[in-house]
Amino acid sequence: MINHNVFKNLANINLENFKDKPTSLTEGQQEASLVLWTSADGHCKIGIWECQPGRFTADRTTAGEYCQIIRGRATVMMVDGKNSKEIEPGDLLVLPQGWKGEWIIHEHMRKLFVIDESSKH
């Protein structure tokens, strides 16, 4: 039998171990994350992520990502600077597999993420 899960109060789950963001273009920018659930085959992960204000690159070559913004504000754009989109609480951001771009975090951000690696296998 396959069980279901409920994760409550995602806005207030405690995230610890903030560390430097490896792809940051802003010195000292830090992030933290917590994976809440992983599929049995390991191809799908759901979790919470937080990041301090600043700018960083992102590469979704191997997996798509779906982001429900819980708090904070950011601008997300393609690697060439085109298709700039503002995101804020309540928004759903879809980054299809193959997307490359940049994020500019304007206000400390928290999001629920779903990473889907199923199409790379």
Stretch-by-stretch model annotation:
Residues M1-H43:
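A short, N-terminal "cap"/entry segment at the start of jelly-roll beta-barrel domains
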Residues Q30-A32, G42-G47, E65, I70-G72, ...:
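A generic structural signal for short beta-strands and their flanking turns/coil linkers
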Residues D59-T62, Y66-P89:
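A short beta-strand-loop-beta hairpin characteristic of the jelly-roll/cupin
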Residues K45-T61, Q97:
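Conserved short histidine dyad/triad with adjacent acidic residue
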